[in-house]
Regions:
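Solvent-exposed loop/turn segments connecting transmembrane beta-strands
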Residues: 69-71, 87, 97-108, 135-145, ...
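Cleavable N-terminal export/targeting peptides
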Residues: 1-39, 189
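Outer-membrane beta-barrel "beta-signal"
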Residues: 55-57, 174-189
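Hydrophobic, lipid-facing positions within transmembrane beta-strands of outer-membrane proteins
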Residues: 47, 73-77, 91, 105-111, ...
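Residues on the lipid-exposed face of transmembrane beta-strands in outer-membrane beta-barrel proteins
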Residues: 51, 77-81, 95, 109-115, ...
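Short glycine/proline- and aromatic-enriched beta-strand/turn motifs that initiate or cap beta-hairpins
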Residues: 23-81
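Transmembrane beta-strands of outer-membrane beta-barrel proteins
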Residues: 45-51, 91-93, 123-129, 161-163, ...
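Short loop/turn motifs that connect adjacent beta-strands in outer-membrane beta-barrel proteins
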Residues: 36-46, 84-90, 116-126, 187-189
Length: 189
């Protein structure tokens, strides 16, 4: 079920996008477009700085005792590169390291796509998705594991507060809202 949910979220986000991908003829066209955008972010993009901060563990998925043991302060950071396409969508490659729920290092690297709607001067709301690999001690002893998740954001100038949801596959696993920030000097100059 977990893998089906991740694949469904990824496909929905791609098909709902306001990019040329929405009218692509095949999955191969979509994949080729995303590879080209990733390559563009890597070589032509601007640097991003990420700061991680908070992980909310859903009360319905964890006992009170378990939640008291878990780390909510997911402190860490990372770097990335982003490029904006002709439609105003942002394509990003990133890597982050932060303390996981068990106070151990978690490594994450991936691709993110975001689209934005203006709300006021310099204020935008965004929705998108991320496809990434993560490695942590309690899941495969740091063996890289793939995941796809939705992202929501509020961007003001060059600063962006972002949130993603990590779905659960069992009791005491997943069901986390993860908050982090991104600063990109490209915006709000």
């Amino acid at each position: 079920m977990y893998n089906r949910l991740s694949v469904t979220l990824f496909i929905f986000a791609v098909l709902a996008s306001r990019s040329p991908v929405a009218s692509a003829d095949s999955f191969g066209d979509i994949f080729a477009y995303k590879v080209e955008r990733s390559r563009s972010a890597l070589y032509d993009g601007r640097w991003d700085v990420y700061l991680t901060g908070y992980a909310w563990h859903a009360p319905y998925a964890y006992s009170r005792e378990k939640r008291d043991e878990l780390n909510d302060a997911s402190l860490g950071g990372g770097l990335g590169r982003s490029v904006v396409d002709a439609n105003g969508n942002t394509h990003s490659l990133y890597g982050m390291i932060f303390r996981d729920s068990h106070y151990k290092a978690q490594y994450t690297a991936g691709y993110a796509w975001m689209t934005y709607w203006p709300a006021a001067e310099k204020l935008d709301f965004g929705l998108g998705y991320t496809v990434f690999l993560f490695a942590r001690s309690d899941i495969g002893k740091y063996f890289p594991t793939p995941l796809a998740s939705p992202i929501a954001s509020v961007r003001y100038g060059s600063f962006e507060l972002m949130a993603t949801a990590v779905p659960g596959i069992a009791h005491d696993s997943g069901n986390i809202a993860f908050l982090f920030a991104r600063w990109n000097p490209r915006y709000g100059n």
